[in-house]
Each structure stands twice: as structure tokens, then as C-alpha cells.
UniProtKB/Swiss-Prot annotation:
InterPro entries: Fmt, Formyl_trans_C, Formyl_transf_N, Formyl_transf_N_sf, Formyl_transferase-like_C_sf, Met-tRNA-FMT_C, Met-tRNA-FMT_N. It comes from Corynebacterium aurimucosum (strain ATCC 700975 / DSM 44827 / CIP 107346 / CN-1) (Corynebacterium nigricans). Coiled coil: none annotated. It comes from the Bacteria. It catalyses: L-methionyl-tRNA(fMet) + (6R)-10-formyltetrahydrofolate = N-formyl-L-methionyl-tRNA(fMet) + (6S)-5,6,7,8-tetrahydrofolate + H(+). It is an enzyme of class 2 (transferase). This is Methionyl-tRNA formyltransferase. Attaches a formyl group to the free amino group of methionyl-tRNA(fMet). The formyl group appears to play a dual role in the initiator identity of N-formylmethionyl-tRNA by promoting its recognition by IF2 and preventing the misappropriation of this tRNA by the elongation apparatus. Its EC number is 2.1.2.9. It holds the Pfam family Formyl_trans_N. One of its GO terms (cellular component) is cytosol. CDD domains: FMT_core_Met-tRNA-FMT_N, Met_tRNA_FMT_C. SUPFAM superfamilies: FMT C-terminal domain-like, Formyltransferase. (6S)-5,6,7,8-tetrahydrofolate binds at S114, L115, L116, P117.
Amino acid sequence: MRIIFAGTPEPAVVALQKLIESHHEVAAVITRPDARRGRGRSLHPSPVKALAEEHGIEVLTPTTLKQGTEDGDALRARLAEIAPEAIPVVAYGNLITEDLLSLPKHGWVNLHFSLLPTWRGAAPVQAAIAAGDERTGATTFRIDQGLDTGDILATMEETIRPTDTADDLLTRLAYAGGDLLVETMNGLEDGSIIPQPQEGEATYAHKIATEDARIDWTAKVDVIDRHIRAHTPGPGAWTLLGESRLKVGPVSVVEPAELGELSDTTALTSLQPGEVHVAKKEVMVGTGSTPVRLGQIQPPGKKMMNAADWGRGLSSQASQAAEGGQVEVKFS
């Protein structure tokens, strides 16, 4: 089946590669225009464009899909020439206008990383981890004018592991979802797939802003653990130390039974939310329930570092500033 692929970021590359390796003909890709990145602000192609060019596939990079614009009209003309039977979509990042949806025989088919109608929207993987869901998955559906509301074509399930970060889970879903997308194209081609309307209560995963990633240390420890993993690696869970913003990597929960085995049990059980306790080989932070043990932390202008090394730096500063070297630090 002749298809055009629409996608932009790294997770979309996996699906494109699997489609290229299938018997389907990827006649072209649609992706976002080159973007400026890095300190030099030089132009870089999207990951999807880079892969397409490696395989000699035509690349279309319209700034808009709106009819009546130069880019939008040029895209429509090219689509008419290529005449794809379906346009699979993975994280393309541009609004698909209503008149375009009916152009391919089988429509525009989106790969969404949740079990719809659960977690419609921009950040379904992060939302599933933060909510404490035990399972999620991927869904292929025919795009309509709603927000992830189209008829379902196929689904697959994936277990969320207790230590999964958003990156861990998204990586697994990208590979399994890529296979699902190929299977969906196969089913549309041979007529074995019958679109089904979405059923059940919808939930929504809004686009994540930097402020959303801030850690609330008054929350219970399991909520904080999930919040940090959900925002790792991007945009990165963060907290304030004075006026400095620090990114915090995944933490480990200090279980109540474990407290009795630690040398500073009294100090740890009395930690207030956000209060930091520096020991010889670890850094603990108080929460709304039991403490957490920091794994990695990123001070401003530096790379991620071992939290124990960061804690020793704090101890050194304290010993220079006050007799006895007592470390009194609190995140906010």
C-alpha cells in the first residue's frame, strides 16, 4: 500500500523505520521544518527528516497545512500527485485541517501512546506514570476533528513498571507501537480491520509546562516518586534551593522498616517536607510522609551528578561557614 508518513521527533523514527522495512511503499514523509537548536542556534532537521533522507524518501516540510496558504496549497497539490492510500501519523506536531482528512482512502491514522479514551492529549505517557496507572498501551485510530476522538483501529497493552521514567516507557511503547502501526496498515489494506467508536470515560493529558514539573514536597512520597519519574528526562522535575533551581532525578523511597536500620533515625523521622538531611553516603529529603533518598541532582549550569557528591559539597561549605558543620538546607 502506498503511504505518506507524518511525524517529527525521535519516537516517530521507530515507526517510520518499521514502515520502511515493511512491504508498504513510503512515498514521502511530512515533518516539521528544520529548527534552531544548541548554543550556536544552527538549523537541524527533525529526526524523521534525517531518517527519510538516509533512505532517499521525499521530505515535505510545510510550515502550515491551512488551505489558501502557499505551503498548504503546495502540500495539497503534492498529495494529489502521490495519491497515498493512508497517512500514518506519529507525533507530527501540526494541526491537520478538516479538508485534508478525507483525501487518503483510509484517512490519516494516528499512533497514540495510551489506551484511548484514557489520556487523550499531548502527554499521555507522563500522565499515566504520574497517576500511578499499572498499565497503559498504544492505540491506532482514524483522525477526526476532535482531540484524539476518532474511531479505534487497533490497540496493544504495556505494563508500567515501578521504576519506569517517561523515557523508559515511551521507548518501549515506540517499538511496540511501531509494530502496531504496521499491523494497522496491513489490516486496512486487506480489509480485516473494522473501525470501532471509542467507549468509556475520557481522561486528558495536557501539554506539560515547566512549572508543572516543580516538586511539591508536601505530597506523599509515592506521589513525589511518580511525579519525578513522569517528568524524566524532560522537562525534568525541579525544586528551588534559595533562588537556585535544581533538577532532581529519580529517587528511591525510604521504607518505614528501613528507617530503624539507619544511624540517623531520629533526624530522618523528624524531617519536614523539603528539608534535606546529608549523611556520609546519601542525601535524604522530607516529604508529606516518609523521606526519599536522592539519586541524582543537577545544580544550575552543571550536568547531572551523584546526589551524595552534591551533599558532600554542601557539608564542606557548611563546615567552612559554621563551627560543627551542621547542614541545614530546605527545598521549596
